[in-house]
């Protein structure tokens, strides 16, 4: 839902005046109902703002994570230490470990 689709603001609802006719609606009931609508509208607007901020934060986080180099799958510190140990044995011979 973009801001362009929203037709009313809480202020628009608050300031809306209805014409009175002889057999019109009870003005107090209309006012009470509009008060509820305004509160809901404000809550929805606040939640929408929070979700937009969270969305922007998560997009930034995704971008940062995508920039980080990835380690090859299955390569752990233990695997690296094993490879290093094997290379040392090969280069220096078994005397180092005896």
Swiss-Prot record:
The keyword Coiled coil applies. It is found in: Cytoplasm. Pfam families: DivIVA. The keyword Metal-binding does not apply. Its main location: cytoplasm. Keywords: Cell cycle, Cell division, Cell shape, Coiled coil, Cytoplasm. GO terms for biological process: cell division; regulation of cell shape. One of its GO terms (cellular component) is cytoplasm. Residues 34-71 form a coiled coil. It comes from the Bacteria. Belongs to the GpsB family. PANTHER family: CELL CYCLE PROTEIN GPSB, CELL DIVISION PROTEIN DIVIVA. Divisome component that associates with the complex late in its assembly, after the Z-ring is formed, and is dependent on DivIC and PBP2B for its recruitment to the divisome. Together with EzrA, is a key component of the system that regulates PBP1 localization during cell cycle progression. Its main role could be the removal of PBP1 from the cell pole after pole maturation is completed. Also contributes to the recruitment of PBP1 to the division complex. Not essential for septum formation. Forms polymers through the coiled coil domains. Interacts with PBP1, MreC and EzrA. This is Cell cycle protein GpsB. The gene is gpsB.
